[in-house]
């Protein structure tokens, strides 16, 4: 009996083990098949698929998704042919770049040419390529190549000063990183299947180089190093940086539609600067500003010099052509005028044009920095105030622009004015650069000084006896409010009317003072142009007081236009 029971138990256990093993094998096979399917699915996934499926915090910090594909194969082939590219391209680049440098040669130099130019033995590395479907359109292909070059070229500049001194200057330690854009357009049914190639530097991520006088020191001649470096950077910035592009016809045809064309006009008023860094050992700086979108000599505007001031007021208006509002920017540089010597840079600032709303005035204060590319300057160099108004081409009639000559026309003159006058895109440059009639806008400006709040305490009792002086700078007319005693939050609600003879070039100043029996102390001020009130007709706003530790001033402005005249010049 015991034997039979043991036999039964043995058979049952063996059968159970066989069933369990078969079950396990089936489950394992199913899991392996599922895992193989999952791995195959992951293998077919693109980078975009993985970014959609998995959250951003799932990836470690060292994982970077690039929109560009690697080009190791191209770099290997480029290294092989680079010696031949160096021989073939050096002279071609030299002859092409020299005329560009001549356009940007600074006034302190008589000439700037190459005496030697070779690309060296180190080939550039293409780190990525991408096709821009959104930019290509149905009739073209747009490609972007990311390039890095730490080369060893042999570049020697022959620099001649106005005094006739010739200096051989070597450009060394060149490092460049950027993105080039290639446009194959239009697509045609004739080999090589595109009519022209356009190329441009879409993004300049980094450009470093050093200058050295062969057999001497560049610092021995003040200003030369900065002038040459600025010339090289400006030439690169304006000659091939997007939206500027070079067009190479591949097949015969008219490719004028690929050329850079104006898309609008930018009105810029350089109002003032404050708290500028002092560059003079004795006295104060003599600041002036230059403004440009493209740093061509005929497209760079310069204000007058304000002597011995760290808080200059210019209030000067300039006009600029805009070719690509999405990528271009306005640059302002403030210098200290040194007379016969070279000017010293106080600071610079930039405004992207894509931040501007067409037809709406943008009043902005910009912090000045030493280098616009590095942006690591912590030193206080001051601020500059700009007033910007962008008008797209073809929409001038629907947007109010007091700087436009049509703004000063009477209703009858607008009816009689021919439609075709300066309306085409090809006439935009002529319209902006030509000397046109000055626009004179007359009217009545009503200024209501409403109130102030949070004024700094200037009296011994912790109060202030505040009043406001209102001044129109050009007409030199003044008015002042009553004194509100013992208050840091005075309320005036007083209105003053001013007859303005030239509103576009006038400036409104409101100065808050503390009244004392033995004198008066200035608390702070607000300076503004009349452009906004001319466009909006009427507005009320709180303004921060410049020169004060704290405090704001509430002002209500109203503009009533009068007879508008045109002054022939």
From Swiss-Prot:
InterPro entries associated with the record: C2_dom, C2_domain_sf, SMP_LBD, Synaptotagmin_plant, Synaptotagmin_SMP
Protein topology in the membrane: Single-pass membrane protein
Chain residues that bind Ca(2+) 1: 459, 465, 514, 516
Domain SMP-LTD residues, every copy: 67-251
Entry-linked Gene3D superfamilies: C2 domain
The UniProt record lists the keyword Transmembrane: yes
Region of interest (Phospholipid binding), ranges: 229-531
GO aspect biological process, one term: lipid transport
Keywords: Calcium, Lipid transport, Lipid-binding, Membrane, Metal-binding, Repeat, Transmembrane, Transmembrane helix, Transport
Record: residues binding Ca(2+) 2: 459, 514, 516, 521
C2 domain location: 245-366, 426-543
Bilayer-crossing regions: 1-21
Cofactor(s) named in the record: Ca(2+)
Any one Gene Ontology cellular component term annotated for this protein: membrane
Keyword Repeat: yes
Compartment(s): Membrane
Molecular function GO terms recorded: lipid binding; metal ion binding
Matches recorded under PANTHER family: EXTENDED SYNAPTOTAGMIN-RELATED, SYNAPTOTAGMIN-4
Family: Belongs to the synaptotagmin family.
Function: May be involved in membrane trafficking.
Protein name as annotated: Synaptotagmin-4
Gene symbol of the encoding locus: SYT4
